[in-house]
Amino acid sequence: MAAPPAPAAKGSPQPEPHAPEPGPGSAKRGREDSRAGRLSFCTKVCYGIGGVPNQIASSATAFYLQLFLLDIAQIPAAQVSLVLFGGKVSGAAADPVAGFFINRSQRTGSGRLMPWVLGCTPFIALAYFFLWFLPPFTSLRGLWYTTFYCLFQALATFFQVPYTALTMLLTPCPRERDSATAYRMTVEMAGTLMGATVHGLIVSGAHRPHRCEATATPGPVTVSPNAAHLYCIAAAVVVVTYPVCISLLCLGVKERPDPSAPASGPGLSFLAGLSLTTRHPPYLKLVISFLFISAAVQVEQSYLVLFCTHASQLHDHVQGLVLTVLVSAVLSTPLWEWVLQRFGKKTSAFGIFAMVPFAILLAAVPTAPVAYVVAFVSGVSIAVSLLLPWSMLPDVVDDFQLQHRHGPGLETIFYSSYVFFTKLSGACALGISTLSLEFSGYKAGVCKQAEEVVVTLKVLIGAVPTCMILAGLCILMVGSTPKTPSRDASSRLSLRRRTSYSLA
């Protein structure tokens, strides 16, 4: 991250590259830096709105893509496993590639990161639409959905890496960055709630129980053309949000210039920067812990709808349960931001544990009242699991910058490699879990699944997320976590960044 120099009168001498001595002048400069680093309410909201389309699309795919591929496209579970695994791996592989090219890109009139966000938008929208399109042929549907899911995940990565790294270039103030992150998470979740509501209401007619009651055949149910059209309409609604939200992002957010860009001296290569970041102990602990936690959340989301449809009598409550998860996540995000500021980030991590007993309860007692309680608690836990890593990453970057003489640009490597590892873990978790459905005898399009499939879904909704969350929290709790830099440390960090080398 690059921090702008503190305001000074014309002709004043430039600061020397050493820590300023404490005193009245230092305190005054600290207050001026704090005021200069403040972000307006409009900027924070517009920054959050920019991430809404990707979150809407990700939420729709998380809750409904697996069900769509199995029951509407009627692809065998083994092929669905390959589609999900290939798409996630494609998105994961795109992260270091995105970090490499973004760090080598030159600053333009709109910044260094913003052009990547703008350039990816139309292609993401097209890939997302065709992901939900049912082609007329049947033999190559697996290849069709693998292609477009891989394209969507890769393009979404090239959008998300610069968008999330933009947090470090909004302001030099750590507290304001945390606030911008909270605004982003809240606005994104509100958009996700709206998108999931619209998507779910549109496609609900494709999964009604009368679809099975109307036929006496034990084999797969014929897919109605109306069901495929409903998914296309839902996809088109999501596609429209991309140009609208990105326009607001460009109008309301200004990327700060990088004052160390013209600094002399050799640059740091991408591979050298990646080697440095992946050997930083606080970063390693953060990444490994959230490998398990994020994979648990993805498994819970992916199998909730399938569990309600095939392993319990909750198919009439699917929309209500999804909305409960998202509403509780949206409402609890501001509360978790207050907890982060008041009690610290490590303490807030215990909120993720709340999902564990309730996930087991849902698998054991799959009734409607229990399901709604579990959905509410899961939403609260998901909120903190999403907010916490993005709030801790800037502190990890600052901790790294205080220990190493390397300038701005490395923040993109931190963000891209974090997303790479979490996506890779999600790919493995979803791929293996979906393959387990194939081994248990899941039949695409069949109304009543075998008892082995029901047991497998209960394990996937209860035991698997529980083990992953416990493992992730144990790793996160070991050792100390980076603290928010003090005022003097922030001043030293700002001086070091202004006198250090930039990333080549």
Curated annotation (Swiss-Prot):
The keyword Glycosyltransferase does not apply. SUPFAM superfamilies: MFS general substrate transporter (SSF103473). It holds the Pfam family MFS_2. GO terms for cellular component: plasma membrane. It is a multi-pass membrane protein. It is found in: Cell membrane. It catalyses: sphing-4-enine 1-phosphate(in) = sphing-4-enine 1-phosphate(out); sphinganine 1-phosphate(in) = sphinganine 1-phosphate(out); sphinga-4E,14Z-dienine-1-phosphate(in) = sphinga-4E,14Z-dienine-1-phosphate(out). Residues 1-33, 483-504 are annotated as: Disordered. Changing D95A: Abolishes export of sphingosine-1-phosphate. Disulfide bonds: none annotated. Residues 494-504 have a biased composition (Basic residues). Its main location: membrane. Residues 14-23 have a biased composition (Pro residues). Keywords: Cell membrane, Lipid transport, Membrane, Transmembrane, Transmembrane helix, Transport. GO terms for molecular function: sphingolipid transporter activity; symporter activity. Lipid transporter that specifically mediates export of sphingosine-1-phosphate in red blood cells and platelets. Sphingosine-1-phosphate is a signaling sphingolipid and its export from red blood cells into in the plasma is required for red blood cell morphology. Sphingosine-1-phosphate export from platelets is required for platelet aggregation and thrombus formation. Mediates the export of different sphingosine-1-phosphate (S1P) species, including S1P(d18:0) (sphinganine 1-phosphate), S1P (d18:1) (sphing-4-enine 1-phosphate) and S1P (d18:2) (sphinga-4E,14Z-dienine-1-phosphate). Belongs to the major facilitator superfamily. PANTHER family: MAJOR FACILITATOR SUPERFAMILY DOMAIN-CONTAINING PROTEIN, SPHINGOSINE-1-PHOSPHATE TRANSPORTER MFSD2B. This is Sphingosine-1-phosphate transporter MFSD2B. It comes from Homo sapiens (Human).
